[in-house]
């Protein structure tokens, strides 16, 4: 059975996922130090839910594609697949035995 996250762990998990989105940086703004670090915050919730549900890669890829469509930008399928693989590996390695 999954262990319930402490509040500090939940914040850490959220921050780490936000950092992954910032690293992916589909808009290309994270090179600007004055740009807010929460640019991709609204995409973390749906991403986290899919990760918690152990969604298939394709479902996560579809979500990232729709998020990028919403932003009005695109990314290569390979870039999206690498990003999804990285998110899933991070979650499985560190957080898969936990729950909110």
Residue spans for each PLM region:
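Charged, amphipathic alpha-helical regulatory modules used
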Residues: 1-100
């Amino acid at each position: 059975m999954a262990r319930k996250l402490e509040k500090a762990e939940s914040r850490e998990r959220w921050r780490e996922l936000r950092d992954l989105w910032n690293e992916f940086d589909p808009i290309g703004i994270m090179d600007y130090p004055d740009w807010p670090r929460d640019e991709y915050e609204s995409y973390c919730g749906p991403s986290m839910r899919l990760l918690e549900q152990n969604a298939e890669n394709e479902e996560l890829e579809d979500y990232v594609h729709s998020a990028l469509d919403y932003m009005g930008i695109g990314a290569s399928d390979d870039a999206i697949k690498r990003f999804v693989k990285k998110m899933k590996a991070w979650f499985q390695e560190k957080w898969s035995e936990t729950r909110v």
